[in-house]
């Protein structure tokens, strides 16, 4: 049946997305300029933020790059922000973009080693609770030294590998190397239930690992990008940063691990799914088959990948170069020494991360609108106006937490630390209060932001990855599964800010572990970020 040209244009717009979704996006594009010019630019700015969050929430209906990108282009066109401000945001976050382009591709070339290690862990640890704790703890430990995005890229790579192994067998194509694991049409009805259980099992492990990256990432100055900016502004080095965060990070870490155990034991919020026996059998058979067929060429590849993994951890922990550049070195070393020299073989490695890199650039355009329209200014001003120092600490933590749930935590942390630094320089607050506020800002941006995928770049990457539709991980499901962690991490962090931070910091001073900062040390700290 032929289709008219007009209908063809409508059908092509956002492709297979539902009609109601297309109408919603078109409505946003009509409403935004009207609100901006005839109502209030501030209101239009917040409207854009809400609409962008909507596109993220609907990521399984339509990848957010297209609808979010259209909204961002229009925002720039009508003057909500400028191309220069967007470019400034991209330049300020170039390390994150380099990381996505090169590090995620680098991890792709280490897939054999990762599958080898994690298959042993998955088969070796029979208890789901112990396995969940292992994933959460390992992700936390790695995120204290590596970037959370790198850790999540590793976990996603492993999960896709596990999923593909089972799906290939369940579809009756055990030996096929060209099997499409995104298509369920060949899956036997008897195995479909196992497949659903397996998806639930992988979902829970991924969220545990994702929260683990937040638990570990808050502890050190290299754990998250905003930590580096905060440490820089405060003039703290690696060791001092860890000690200053301890009054909050130690109880939060313990309670986070206890939450991991509790949700698995109670089976709430989508947790508790066990590895189906049929799936375990397939993975064990796969592991035995791999072991039997492994040649010296395969062993040589594993050894090379192991050595590259050591270089990766050492290079990142010691900050020998920008994260993305270390990722590029991983690509070069891994391909050179494992014989991957064809361009088309290398192209696959970049498929996963480049759409997300483009999405992140759009995200920074929205951040540029937040800056130019001063959307957060009323909240920041209200918190800084509070006289009581204890209440100010708690309010900073809460305000950071709430804003980090709707915006990028790197941006929120940067804006707040710059405002507090300005207050210190103007003599509004003391150096001691500045140090305590810096701790509140760091923990506030890192802990409550696990509530939604927009707060943590690692969560957003997971939501928009090729894995999410395979294991049916939607925005709403992520928020629901993160809920127990959000409540525990946010409340324990708040408790630590109110009751532990000041007395324990004073105790650390008395013990001589850290020294009180001076205004001079903050003045000499090199300004970073915005």
UniProtKB/Swiss-Prot annotation:
Pfam families on file: NhaB (PF06450)
Transmembrane portions of the chain: 13-33, 34-54, 90-110, 121-141, 145-165, 205-225, 241-261, 306-326, 327-347, 351-371, 455-475, 481-501
Catalytic activity: 2 Na(+)(in) + 3 H(+)(out) = 2 Na(+)(out) + 3 H(+)(in)
Keywords: Antiport, Cell inner membrane, Cell membrane, Ion transport, Membrane, Sodium, Sodium transport, Transmembrane, Transmembrane helix, Transport
Topological category with respect to the lipid bilayer: Multi-pass membrane protein
One GO molecular-function entry: sodium:proton antiporter activity
A cellular component term, taken from the record's GO annotations: plasma membrane
Record localization: Cell inner membrane
InterPro entries: Na+/H+_antiporter_NhaB
Similarity-based family: Belongs to the NhaB Na(+)/H(+) (TC 2.A.34) antiporter family.
Record function comment: Na(+)/H(+) antiporter that extrudes sodium in exchange for external protons.
Protein name: Na(+)/H(+) antiporter NhaB
Record organism: Aliivibrio fischeri (strain MJ11) (Vibrio fischeri)
Taxonomic classification: Bacteria, Pseudomonadati, Pseudomonadota, Gammaproteobacteria, Vibrionales
